[in-house]
Every structure is written in structure tokens, then in C-alpha cells.
Amino acid sequence: MIFKNGPKRLGPILLAQRGGSPLKGYWSLPGGLLETGETLEEGIAREVLEETGLRVEVVEFYGIFQRVMRDAKGRAEYHYLLVDYVCKVLGGTLQAGDDVARVEWVPRRRLKEYQMTEGTLSVIEEAYDRALRKRT
């Protein structure tokens, strides 16, 4: 998760619109697959750069989430294990790249306007709530 004003402030969050299957057109947090030999932190930084044009520093572990997508017959078609971290932008120019159609900074009040991949909205809302609790 990448917040525009850094992980300690509650500004807009960066979303990427998927450019290919599965779930083409849906919005999600930037990310992707690890390459052989990469650490989680290296893979996150590489994927964010490829998808958004931004260089990031991985700041803290957020959580692990599982997502199973089933076909019409109920069989598992995709099974994802998502490891989320909070990141801070170091530089770069925001632009859609790699396998995304668009990237946008989205304010919390507008999140429900975006068609997101399953579970993404609840993860983001919890991140905002967690950040608010840390501030008090």
C-alpha cells in the first residue's frame, strides 16, 4: 500500500487498474509475482516501479491475505497468497506501465466509486483505520 503523503499521513492511496486477465479493468493495489531469488521487499519495489513508474521504500509489513477465484463450476481457477506492505514513495513519475491500464491516487472518500478486486476495499479501509489508531 502506498499513501501519497507517506505512511504516517492519511492522504490518497495508489490504485492500479488491471490491464489483463484475470479481472481486467478492476482496480487493486500495485503488486505482482516474485522473481526467483528476490526477497519480498525487492519484488515489491520492482513491481511498483514496473506498474507505476514510482520508486518506493518498503516501510512495514501489513498483512497476509488469501484469495481463491473459482470458475463457473466452483473449481479453483486462481489461488493467490497476497503479502501486503506499506511503502513510501522515494521518487519517479506516476505513469501506467507493464500490465496495468491506469494508475491513480484515490482519496478515501472516493474508494467505493472504483470496481476493485475482491477484498481490496476492506484491506484499504482497515489500513486507514489502523493508521488513525496509531495517531491517537
Predicted features, each with a name:
Residues 28, 55, 105:
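Short aromatic/basic micro-patch
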